[in-house]
Amino acid sequence: MIESRLLPKETTRRPLKKTNRMSFFDDLPFWHAVLIFLIFIWSGFVRSGLGFGGAVLSLPFLLLVHDQPLIFLPLVSVHLLVFSSLTIAQPIVVAGIEAGDWRLDTNIDWLYLRKILAITIVPKLLGVFGVISLPSHVITNFIFVIVLIYGISYLLNRQFVSNHPTLDLIFLLLGGYISGTSLIGAPLIIAVMARHLLREKLRDTLFALWFILVSIKLAAFAAAGIDLQWWAHLWLLPAAGIGHILGLKFHRYSLQVEPKRFMQFIGAALIFVALAGLWQTSVAAS
């Protein structure tokens, strides 16, 4: 169990304001830094390999290292912006260089994307307000409970499926709110989008959606005076970049097969991490 480096009681109030210090990473123990570096490699891998999961499959591990969500959410948000843009732009750039065709021809379903945004934008904003205003331990426990539910569904191969317009609406509203609080609403949103989009269009349309929603979240963080940890990107963006390249290779493989065993393994890991995180926060509170 990784011992949580809790902030002193008087400094755990929200939001985390900008200071003249570089960031909390200044006095981070070396082995914590190594763990965070490896977790961000994993984050980049699952984001580009699966089209989602950069947050839901990495944030629980990060919170075991340090249980302050507002330390890591800005980092994960910026990585989502950078690598979702790269993933969408890469085919355009490759086609332009190899064939001289620079048309903005993407696999994004813009019409459906506008429909999804119209539904998710309000709960997204409510979730962002919640993560800024609520105490850290409340958000941390909320994240671990949601991750536990996801882990059980993956382990049992019972992923969220929507087969009715009313259920579509419920999943999108919940997914928008959870995304606003913790960036882990992807499985609920994907349950809806996967039913309406071709598989070739799903990943890029998801990335476009994440880009817009995360931009809103980062703008809210900046407006609230939360430290966006810009200096930490100097060493964590390369980590996510390594994972991103590996994930692109995995994505090409996953289009040909159904990686059920992989997702079941992920589910078991998420259950373990979520239970460990809930136990850790309960011990810290007692």
Question: What positions do the PLM features span?
Answer:
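Alpha-helical multi-pass membrane helix bundles of inner-membrane/thylakoid proteins
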Residues: I143-V145, I152-G175
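Short, strongly hydrophobic alpha-helical membrane anchors
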Residues: L16-W31, A284-S286
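Small-residue-rich hydrophobic segments that form or flank transmembrane alpha-helices
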Residues: H32-W110, F171-G180, I184-I245
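Selective transmembrane alpha-helices of multi-pass membrane proteins
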Residues: I116, T120-V128, S136-L156, W235-K249, ...
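Membrane-interface helix-boundary motifs at transmembrane edges
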Residues: N107, N157-N163, H196-E200, R252-K260
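Interfacial loop-to-helix junctions that mark the boundaries of transmembrane helices
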Residues: F24-P29, L70-I71, S133-T140, Q229-H233, ...
